[in-house]
Amino acid sequence: MESAPSGGLLALIIISIILLACISAVVSAYETAITSITSYKWSNYVKTHNKQKKLTTKIVNHFQKNYSACLITILVANNIVAILVSNILFLALDQSIKNPAISSALNLLISGVLLLMLCEITPKTLARINIIRVLVYFAVVVYFFYILFWPITKLASIIFAKYEKAPPVSRRDVYFFIDEIEQNGLFTKEDGQLIKRTLIFDQVLVDQIMIKWNRVVYCYEGDPVKTIKEKFLHGQFSRMPVLDQTSNEVVGFIHLKDLFSSLEKSNEPFVLQELLYPAVLVSNTTPIKQALRQMRLHRAHLAVVQDKHHHTIGIVSMEDIIEELVGEIYDEHDEVEAVQTLDNNTWLVLPNVKAAFFFNKWIKRDLVKSKNMTIQRYLASFENDGLNTQNKLETPWFIAEAIVDSENPEQIRYEIRKKSDVVD
């Protein structure tokens, strides 16, 4: 009958198992860290902490460039450790326990619990919480095994070289990233929408935002001053296209300010042609980003839109283009609408709008039962005694905030934002 291991041998076995378990834990944690880290997060850490010249930084950068070889190093190390631990335990238990079945069962149980709990689950969980620290603290240890297994890692680098390049980031990836940042509260929904609009800014064509020609107010070169004045005053805009009476082509734009400045000079004859700004021509298939650049180059606020046959089909203003980024723009002379749409989930509403009309149409069907209750009364019916200018009202369906006119404190409107998880 074989005797149990001596005290010295038992100590050596325990030390060997602990050492191997530590190695397995380190490489397992590093596997999670190198898989979880993003290039921008690592670059930000290096620049913020001025770690560009550190050895650990160079090692991590090398691992990111040779990702497959790094993972193979970790997998080889883990498998070797698992084999060694299992065999050491088997030899120790085989000498101590007579029954081979019990010995094998204990070997399986101890090595399984040890490797799974202490060398896999625990280190990987901790690595998810401390990604940067794991990458920095254990970089040299993992690099040692990387060099130790160099023939295998080199072969892996050659085989997987064409797969090392990360796939390009798509707009959809960026949208998901923005949504995730919004959910974490790093910036507001409006900020996210502005960034998303910026991403698709170069894809929007002039044809999608232009004012069609049948809606454009214009005048002719030969029109009397009175007619031009009436069109300006009736339309309440600052610029107007001027057409040639013979060809019906746009010859330029006249500015309201120039018109009335000229009329004030009663001692000089009124000559419309002297007040014209040259017309900037853009195609209806031109991206608005390019159209904006062209208008800025010519210092023009309006541009004439033409189709592929060079026929005038509309106009586009710089304001129309900017609204694609920031949403609808209202000035002091715009008529205040009862419900103004700021974005897909946000509205600016007057207090006297019927609550049933607004909430049942835009927030949630059948949310308000009373057909005669106004927005103001409906918001005041909640438990916090209504809405004032110092706080917001938050419900399961929407968030409402009172917006007070700084020049007229009695004039209040409500900014109402629908929550993203509300289903109509």
Swiss-Prot record:
Transmembrane domains' residue ranges: 7-27, 71-91, 101-121, 135-155
InterPro entries attached to this UniProt entry: CBS_dom, CBS_dom_sf, CNNM, Ion_transp-like_CBS
Topology with respect to the bilayer: Multi-pass membrane protein
Chief location of this protein within or outside the cell: membrane
SUPFAM superfamilies assigned to the protein according to its UniProt record, in alphabetical order: CBS-domain pair
GO cellular component: plasma membrane
Keywords associated with the record: CBS domain, Cell membrane, Membrane, Repeat, Transmembrane, Transmembrane helix
Localization annotation: Cell membrane
Domain CNNM transmembrane: 6-191
Domain annotation CBS: ranges: 210-270, 275-335
Similarity comment text for this entry: Belongs to the UPF0053 family.
Name under which the protein is recorded: UPF0053 protein MG146 homolog
Species per Swiss-Prot/TrEMBL record: Mycoplasma pneumoniae (strain ATCC 29342 / M129 / Subtype 1) (Mycoplasmoides pneumoniae)
Lineage of producing organism: Bacteria, Bacillati, Mycoplasmatota, Mycoplasmoidales, Mycoplasmoidaceae
